[in-house]
Amino acid sequence: MTLAIPLELSLFDPTSADFLVPLISFSAYFSVKSFTMRPCPRLLTRKLNYPGHIPLSPAQNALLAVGSGVVGVLDVTRGDLIASLSESTAGIFLPALHEKMKMTPEGRQIMKDRPEITNKTIEKLKELKRGTLGREYVEWLGGGGLEPESRAPVQYIDSPLLAYTMLRYRQTHDLYHTLFSLPPTLPHELSLKVLEFSNMSLPVALLSSVFGPLRLKRKETWTRDWVPWALRTGREGRSLVTVYWEKRWEQGIGELRRELGVERNDADGVEARWGGYRKIREVERELRRKGEWVDEPEDW
């Protein structure tokens, strides 16, 4: 049974009873079922900086961080809470992430063009050959019953420029899964969080990496099999947020990995111990044997 408890707090404006209204639902293990923020009437008079923008005061932003962080870091499958946590802590890391994008020609072009990956994007990718980035992205989405627009929109970041930086990271996250053949399961989501922290220094990824494994049944096995690979790959590879993925849809995914200086996890016994990962790799091998994979020199 889930009990919804509305809690009203008035901070910094005692005349406004609606200043802050977080809606928190508790289950038996205190899992947040919904967490929404309604701005104070004073903030509603401000000009919205982009469609869907919800301006928050510092106090509201702090409460959003705490409320979403308590459960979000423990349950990385709660995309809504992870999204809220990442936005409420954006001031810590987004400027640095934006600077990383500005350091490469490809990253600067992304910020100039501001491309977005939508459901319409993937329709034309279905015709590409197996083994291309675009087609494997479509196959990965289909295998998990996901779609590009299932990601939460950016709402709480004031700067339109930084809001797009966050949107870009959010929309390309599933491409990282595709690049490394990682299925959308908790152990592999956590592995990717470790990699993202190593690659982009994301605080949310760090928190998820530290607390998320508490929910794993095979913590020690996961730590041994995935953490060293994720840390090394993230550290040694190119910053993934600077990749203009849309210009690489037709590129062989193995060729792309070599260009970015990254590799999949080929440590001894990893495939045998992780069935979801093994299944993706086996499908690729079978397509290669049939000659239905793009011709590229890569160990498989």
UniProtKB/Swiss-Prot annotation:
Q: Which cofactor does it need?
A: Zn(2+)
Q: Does the keyword Mitochondrion apply?
A: yes
Cellular localization per UniProt: Mitochondrion inner membrane
Which of this chain's residues are annotated to bind Zn(2+)? 173-174, 177, 189
- Please state the protein's primary subcellular location: mitochondrion
Superkingdom field: Eukaryota
Q: Which reaction does it catalyse?
A: a 4-hydroxy-3-methoxy-5-(all-trans-polyprenyl)benzoate + H(+) = a 2-methoxy-6-(all-trans-polyprenyl)phenol + CO2
InterPro entries attached to this UniProt entry = Coq4, Coq4_euk
Q: What is its EC number?
A: 4.1.1.130
The record's Gene Ontology biological-process terms are: ubiquinone biosynthetic process
| UniProt membrane topology term | Peripheral membrane protein
Keywords attached to this entry: Lyase, Membrane, Metal-binding, Mitochondrion, Mitochondrion inner membrane, Ubiquinone biosynthesis, Zinc
Coiled-coil positions: none
Q: Which PANTHER family match?
A: UBIQUINONE BIOSYNTHESIS PROTEIN, UBIQUINONE BIOSYNTHESIS PROTEIN COQ4 HOMOLOG, MITOCHONDRIAL
Give the quaternary structure: Component of a multi-subunit COQ enzyme complex, composed of at least COQ3, COQ4, COQ5, COQ6, COQ7 and COQ9.
What this protein is called in its record is: Ubiquinone biosynthesis protein COQ4, mitochondrial
| Organism of provenance | Cryptococcus neoformans var. neoformans serotype D (strain B-3501A) (Filobasidiella neoformans)
Q: What is the lineage of its organism?
A: Eukaryota, Fungi, Dikarya, Basidiomycota, Agaricomycotina
